[in-house]
């Protein structure tokens, strides 16, 4: 573009130079016809040519036309050069764009398969864990059975002592024994017995009553042994539990040996066991308004030392 403009300017300058060279010729010629009048006809033709040649004099208007030199507006048109600059920032965009994948590989955490591979190691251990679970379940069942037995033993030792004394009271009254509790103490024992029976689940009440009957038989055996040793107890054995009823614990300490002595009841004691059991089944449910399953009338297996 610059070269083209330069050539155009040179062409304009050349034309103007030519016009300038031709201009003085007609200026000298009109002076000649003024001095040489006979030659006026010849210059007429020349003058006819001059107007044709002088006509470019008004086209000196191109002199303002070279004013297009300020028409360097093409230079303004060259301003598109900033337009090509636009792609320069445009290519800059891909430069930050490739930077995006650099943070994008951060999500690429190949460490995740490592924890995923860990379950693969744990998966072959699953059959082992299943066997362990079965063993644990069996152990838990055994432990639960042992815990239930221990709970029943604790119930016998602590909670059902009032029920034992209530049945003993009824048994003593039935046989006219002198070992009878006072009325106030007996009412307190009844309340404690009912509270304990209400807390026992219905499925365990039958076994609890059998344990009460068993405790009564063992208590009677203890009294017989003490009588044989000629140790008069009179009402001492009843006075000690009276002081400990509010705490829920009786003075019947031999009950701690009941787990070992549960199988010590002999078959010849079956009539005595049935008698006390019937008395307990008649007294406790009616006194405490508690439901006792009908199968409770059957003696539990193994209580008499038989399998």
Curated annotation (Swiss-Prot):
Post-translational modification: Substrate of transglutaminase.
UniProt KW Signal keyword: yes
Protein name per UniProt: Alpha/beta-gliadin MM1
Function, in words: Gliadin is the major seed storage protein in wheat.
Organism annotation: Triticum aestivum (Wheat)
Signal sequence range: 1-20
Top-level lineage group: Eukaryota
Stretches with biased composition (Low complexity): 29-55, 114-134, 242-260
Stretches with biased composition (Pro residues): 56-71, 81-113
């Amino acid at each position: 573009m610059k070269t083209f403009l330069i050539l155009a300017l040179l062409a304009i300058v050349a034309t103007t130079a030519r016009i300038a060279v031709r201009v003085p010729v007609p200026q000298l010629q009109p002076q000649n016809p003024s001095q040489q009048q006979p030659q006026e006809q010849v210059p007429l033709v020349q003058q006819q040519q001059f107007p044709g040649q002088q006509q470019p004099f008004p086209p000196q208007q191109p002199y303002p036309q070279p004013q297009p030199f300020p028409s360097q507006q093409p230079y303004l048109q060259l301003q598109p050069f900033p337009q090509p600059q636009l792609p320069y920032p445009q290519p800059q965009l891909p430069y930050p764009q490739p930077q995006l994948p650099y943070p994008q590989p951060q999500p690429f955490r190949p460490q995740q398969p490592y924890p995923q591979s860990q379950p693969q190691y744990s998966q072959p251990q699953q059959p082992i864990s299943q066997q362990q679970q079965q063993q644990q379940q069996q152990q838990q069942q055994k432990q639960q059975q042992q815990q239930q037995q221990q709970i029943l033993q604790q119930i016998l030792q602590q909670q059902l002592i009032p029920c034992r004394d209530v049945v003993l009271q009824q048994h003593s009254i039935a046989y006219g024994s002198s070992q009878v509790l006072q009325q106030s103490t007996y009412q307190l024992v009844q309340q404690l017995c009912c509270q304990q029976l209400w807390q026992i689940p219905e499925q365990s009440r039958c076994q609890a009553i059998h344990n009460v009957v068993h405790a009564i038989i063992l208590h009677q055996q203890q009294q017989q042994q003490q009588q044989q040793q000629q140790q008069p107890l009179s009402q001492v054995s009843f006075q000690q539990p009276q002081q400990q009823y509010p705490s829920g614990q009786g003075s019947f300490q031999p009950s701690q040996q009941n787990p070992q002595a549960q199988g010590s009841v002999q078959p010849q004691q079956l009539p005595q066991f049935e008698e006390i059991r019937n008395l307990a089944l008649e007294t406790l449910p009616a006194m405490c308004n508690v439901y006792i399953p009908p199968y409770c009338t059957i003696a539990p297996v193994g209580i008499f030392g038989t399998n």
